[in-house]
Amino acid sequence: MALHPELELDISVNDQHADLVKYNIDIAIRAAHLEDLNLKAKKLIEHSLCYFASPDYLAENGTPQNQSQLSTHKCITYSLMHPSNVWTFEASKVQVNEVIKSDSPDMIVKMARSGAGIAAMPKWMVAEYFENCELVEILPQKHAFSLPMYAVYKNSNHIPDKISAFIKFLSDYFTKNK
């Protein structure tokens, strides 16, 4: 905002795929493999999921040593992934024991921090909790599912300056904070 004080932001935080044209949305951030060919997109980051739990959960339930052991643990899943109870690793998919599911990444992290089970999220979303030991990464040696994150915007011949400026800000931010 300091770079462009004239900009006004109206931010909606949800994980639903809103129709940009129908709702007159300038930019959406999508963590997905894109399917809508009617939108333009700027790739911001490629993020890998990591798997984690609280120290208390692991002390009580043990730490899984491989992906197949996830089926015997309580797992907190993201309900907007389909199917939500299948976690993808580089070379395999594992059906997990889904005890809680939510469409809120924030809620998933909070539940994991409270000891409710094992969860999966992009590493950048939980790195601070690894640093302060509120969460412990499990299976770090396994190659987790990787997902691109894009800034998507309406397909038109002219991109307004405010959209270009915001996309540049996002791109610079994620380049600096990988």
Give the label of every model feature segment.
Residues M1-L37:
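Central regulatory/effector-binding core of bacterial HTH transcription factors
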Residues A2-E6, N132, D172, K176:
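Conserved amphipathic alpha-helical interaction elements at protein-protein interfaces in regulatory
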Residues D10-N14, I138, V152:
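Solvent-exposed beta-strand sheet faces enriched in polar/charged residues
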Residues I29, V109, A127, Y153, ...:
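A cross-family signal for key residues in well-ordered alpha-helices
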Residues L34-S146, K176-N177:
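C-terminal regulatory
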Residues L139-K178:
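A late-sequence structural motif
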